[in-house]
Swiss-Prot record:
Identification of the protein by name: Uncharacterized protein HI_1410
Top-level division of the source organism's lineage: Bacteria
Pfam family, one: Terminase_3C
């Protein structure tokens, strides 16, 4: 029996198993000891934390059944070592977890991209014949009080840290096909946002928007910077885009140089996430200018997208009226829609030393086990409140 972190035997499920053994009157068969359970047929239940015992686990033999409890916390590194270790004929790994984050390795590995011979089963309160009245009452209250928390606790759905998220998950849900719900159409500029992959396992991403409607998202890993720039340019031409906006710092510098060499069939602009705030003297809210509210253009751009999602949520749910160009709609036809929704809701709000809003760094997100939000960043660029400039000015 494994879990990612087990500081003591009391953190394990040994007591739960002992209670079941007693309830089923199996004490004569199982010897429940302090740190293990031994059966008369030679079976043995052992308990360990993966993170602190991963080296010794690699050398374990004779294990034919593994139960990983609280699997949502298990890291990619732990899975990559544990799975090849369980190699007895007919062996199996059973994982039980309540998913926190659609981007977590456990959820991606076994639910989104399950391997062959993997069976994934969603088990909720409806499947529990002993679900108590007290929990039913708590569930109904939570559904009214905090719908996002209810979805996670009682429906087993991965959700964001709603209180800290820049863009709340519930706002994003209401934005799906909002143009159909509210009766507006895709009109205005066609833009392609291009987030360039950093080193390692990072991905490239394109966002395709037409006015206030997000029509498609593409993500890929293969190819170098030049290949990715060419792919983006070809996709933009096919989309009949008016503008490509790309991440122009770091690896993106190579993209800038390559775009300058391409035929000027459409406008191209760079986006410097750490750059100065646009329209610094303009008031964001009464009494507070943009330069007093945001630490950089990245924060300002995420907030601009946040405002679109919030207004769309208010318009769809409560009937509030806003101009179409202040709203946003995510087409339900986007293949990567669920992943995009997760990425949009993961970055947390942060603040600089002067109290201005900034976006949680990718380094801090990585500490939480959250990969770089490439698709979300590509979309943010499409709605960034930047002043138009030519590629030659970058």
């Amino acid at each position: 029996m494994f879990r990612e972190i087990q500081k003591s035997i009391s953190d394990s499920v040994i007591q739960m198993l002992a209670d079941q053994i007693e309830m089923l009157s199996l004490q004569a068969f199982f010897d429940v000891q302090k740190t293990q359970i031994i059966g008369q047929n030679g079976s043995r239940f052992t308990f360990a934390g993966l993170k602190t015992n991963i080296t010794s686990i690699k050398s374990m033999t004779g294990i034919d059944v593994v139960w990983v409890e609280e699997g949502e916390n298990v890291s990619k590194e732990s899975w990559d070592i544990l799975i090849p270790t369980i190699r007895e004929d007919g062996s199996q790994i059973i994982v039980s977890f309540n998913p926190k984050n659609i981007l977590d390795d456990t959820y991606q590995r076994f639910v989104i991209h399950p391997p062959e011979r993997c069976k994934s089963v969603l088990v909720n309160w409806q499947d529990n014949p002993y679900f108590p009245k007290e929990l039913m009452e708590d569930m109904e209250q939570m559904r009214e009080r905090d719908y996002e928390l209810y979805r996670h606790v009682y429906e087993g759905e991965p959700v964001a840290d709603s209180d800290l998220a820049i863009i709340k998950p519930v706002w994003i849900e209401y934005a799906v096909d909002a143009h159909l719900k509210l009766g507006f159409t895709a009109k205005g500029m066609k833009k392609v946002g291009f987030d360039v992959a950093d080193e390692g396992a990072d991905s490239n991403a394109n966002a395709f928007v037409h006015g206030s409607v997000v029509l498609d998202i593409e993500v890929w890993k293969n190819g170098d910077v030049i290949d990715s720039a060419n792919r983006t340019n070809q996709s933009a031409v096919k989309f009949k885009a008016d503008l490509i906006i790309f991440d122009s710092i770091g690896v993106g510098a190579g993209v800038k140089a390559h775009f300058k060499r391409l035929p000027k069939s459409l406008q191209v602009e760079g986006f410097n996430a750490g750059g100065a705030v646009a329209y610094p003297e303009r008031e964001y809210i009464k009494g507070k200018k943009n330069q007093d509210m945001f630490s950089n253009i990245k924060a300002q751009s995420w907030w601009a997208l946040r405002d679109r999602f919030y207004k769309t949520y208010r318009a769809v749910k409560y009937g509030d009226v806003y101009p179409d160009d202040e709203l946003i709609s995510l087409s339900s036809k986007i293949k990567e829609l669920e992943y995009l929704k997760a990425e949009l809701s993961r970055p947390r709000v942060d603040y600089d030393n002067n109290g201005r809003v900034k976006v949680e760094s990718k380094k801090d997100m990585k500490k939480r086990g959250i990969p770089s939000p490439n698709m979300a960043d590509a979309l943010v660029m499409c709605y960034a409140p930047t002043k138009p400039k030519s590629l030659l000015d970058l």
